[in-house]
């Protein structure tokens, strides 16, 4: 696996912020209502930007959210099957989207893409991309 460095992480972060803005712009192209954006900070580390559209012409509600959070320890549930992650700090960043259309014949859409990095002082970071996409009947 290729090693990851601070420049790579910043490049992914900027890409994800652009992705959030591009998705919001695309939704606004078809729905006349405005997104309300709210920046937030996480006490344990990191933060993000929540983007919400409500009561639009096409969509009942859309959320397009960016987060970049960090922490000192991974929970046991995350390390039980991956012992190489035990004792590592972490950083996770991503974009998640949920679209609830007004049309009952159009499915609800959920998607997310994320970068996860587990850091150790004594060895290179362990990192991977994850995500998913699903459509649920209204």
What do the predicted segments below correspond to?
Residues 4-83:
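Gly/Pro-rich turn-and-neighbor structural signature
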Residues 50-128:
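Internal mixed beta-strand/loop scaffold within catalytic domains of large alpha/beta enzymes
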Residues 130-132:
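Long amphipathic alpha-helical segments with strong coiled-coil/leucine-zipper propensity
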């Amino acid at each position: 696996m290729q090693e990851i460095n601070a420049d790579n992480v910043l490049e992914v972060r900027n890409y994800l912020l652009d992705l959030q803005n591009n998705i919001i712009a695309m939704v606004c192209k078809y729905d006349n209502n405005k997104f309300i954006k709210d920046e937030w900070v996480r006490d344990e580390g990191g933060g993000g930007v929540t983007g919400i559209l409500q009561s639009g012409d096409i969509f009942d509600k859309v959320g397009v959210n960016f987060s970049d959070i960090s922490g000192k320890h991974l929970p046991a549930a995350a390390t039980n099957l991956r012992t190489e992650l035990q004792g590592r700090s972490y950083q996770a960043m991503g974009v998640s989207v949920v679209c609830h259309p007004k049309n009952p014949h159009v499915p609800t859409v959920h998607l997310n893409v994320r970068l996860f990095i587990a850091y150790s002082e004594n060895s290179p970071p362990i990192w991977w991309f994850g995500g998913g996409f699903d459509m649920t009947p209204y």
